[in-house]
Structure formats: structure tokens, C-alpha cells
């Protein structure tokens, strides 16, 4: 029922949900559970129910021409490297399950995989997911129909998932010294003015659930992340008492690894043994192995002993 995908970020669990052997319709209320207010295109759509109730939104959208590409304000836009079937869904409710996500998108068309990103140790949802459709037209229809839909007071953002590699390098920021009362909306207000935030995650105390003053903020573009660093690093934001530290998450990871190695007393790697040349003392560089030179070989290492 579950398949593990590859190429995961550190500490993150990505499960591919395979719906083929599961009957979802029996677990969800019918259309009466759907609370639909207004239409698409700026309207307000609230799906407080699950399953078929949420998923029926896609049936309200007209078919999309194969010549049109509606990114829905997504991350790729005209980037031809984007996968035409793989979507990223941001701002999911914290308690949303893979079954509910599948039911929401399934009526837009057949789905290959459907997965909510979670911490592999705690199961904590990072609030975003990937949905891979069988066809590009169904993926386009899902963006047009479900982008902006409100589910349990969360307004979903549905767009094309960006490819990995260089296109997303240096877009993830590590932020410290945030107020211990910071909320997602306040974090969005501080960083949102510098670009399109793809993902944000406030780290919380495992026991109390309160913010630890640390967060990760991922932007859509490298330039947006650099602008946020230039504008906010060593700056005291409104409501805070100390200046923020804002740097690339990759740099933070390298610094943390270096500090850990030093604590273990490992330090930097030792210098290589020099090659023979002027001033080379062979007796010094042969080391302790030189004392075993005259020992007789073990019988197992001398086949002639057994002949």
C-alpha cells in the first residue's frame, strides 16, 4: 500500500500513496457534506467534509485545452523543465491525511502517487504535498479547479512542482532569534514581501508545542532568498527583541556538521604522507608497520605450507 520514494531531504519522510487497492468512497460523506460558497475565479470555496465532498470541486471546472498551460500562479510558469503531471500543494491543514488529499484530487483524473511530506520520526506534517497525475490535462485541470480552495480554514496553493537540482539550490533559509510567540501568518508577513514563499516551517518544542524561535523559509527563486537575507539578517523585526539571524540552510548544515566533528575531536583530515623526494626519510614515514617486516608469514597466507 505504501511505497518509499527516493532523494529525500534530511529528516523528511516522503510516502507515495498507491490508491489501486483501496476503496475510498466508503470512508467519506456524500455531497451534502460539501459547503460551497461562490464560484471559481476569486470565489470562496470551503470544503469542511472529506472524500467525495472535497473532490467534487474538480467536476465543476471546464475541460482545459491541450494548447493552454494554466500555472495557477505556480512555481514554474514558463519553465519548460517542469513536470507537466507533478503538482505541489502548499498550505495543507495540519491534520489532513493522504486519504483526504487523494479524495480531493482524484475526481480531476487518475493519480499515480499522492503524498504529504512529513517528518519521518514524529509524523509531523510539513503542510505541503505532491500529487502526480497520469496525464498533463488532468494536472492542469486540478490547478485551475483547486488552486485557492479553502479546506478547514486553509487556502490551498496548487501549482506545478519544480524539478530538483540547481533550480532550487540556495532558496531555503534558516532563521533564528524569532519571537517565541511567532505564528505562520506573522512569519509570512515578515518574509513574504521579498518573494513567493513556497514552504515555511516553524520549529516547535516537542513537549510544549511552542515555537523555539527557529524556522525554515523556502522561496521560489534564489534571488528572492538573497534579497531576504540582505534585508533581514541582523535586523530586529516588529514585535521582536533581538536581531534575526538569516542565512542559507545549506550553510547552516555545513556549520553544524563542522561543529559536530570538532566536538568528536576529529577535526580536519590529516595531511597526506609526502611522496619520496629531497629530504624524505623512509624510516620515519614507514611507521609502526616496519617492525613486522621480519616476521614469518602465517601458514594460511603461505599456500606452500599445505603442499
Swiss-Prot record:
One example GO MF annotation: mRNA binding
Gene3D superfamilies named in the record: 3.30.70.330
GO CC list: nucleus; ribonucleoprotein complex
Pfam family membership, one: RRM_1
SUPFAM superfamilies: RNA-binding domain, RBD
InterPro entries registered for this protein in UniProt: Euk_RNA-bind_prot (IPR050502), Hud_Sxl_RNA (IPR002343), Nucleotide-bd_a/b_plait_sf (IPR012677), RBD_domain_sf (IPR035979), RRM_dom (IPR000504), Sxl (IPR006546)
Localization in the cell: Nucleus
Main location: nucleus
UniProt region (Disordered), positions on chain: 285-307
UniProt keyword terms in alphabetical order: Nucleus, Repeat, RNA-binding
Biased composition regions of type Basic residues, renumbered to the chain: 285-299
Protein's GO biological process: alternative mRNA splicing, via spliceosome; sex determination
Residues in RRM domain copies: 85-163, 171-251
Function in brief: Unknown; apparently not involved in somatic sex determination.
PANTHER family in the record: OS02G0815200 PROTEIN, RRM DOMAIN-CONTAINING PROTEIN
NCBIfam families: sex-lethal
Identification of the protein by name: Sex-lethal homolog
Species classification: Eukaryota, Metazoa, Ecdysozoa, Arthropoda, Hexapoda
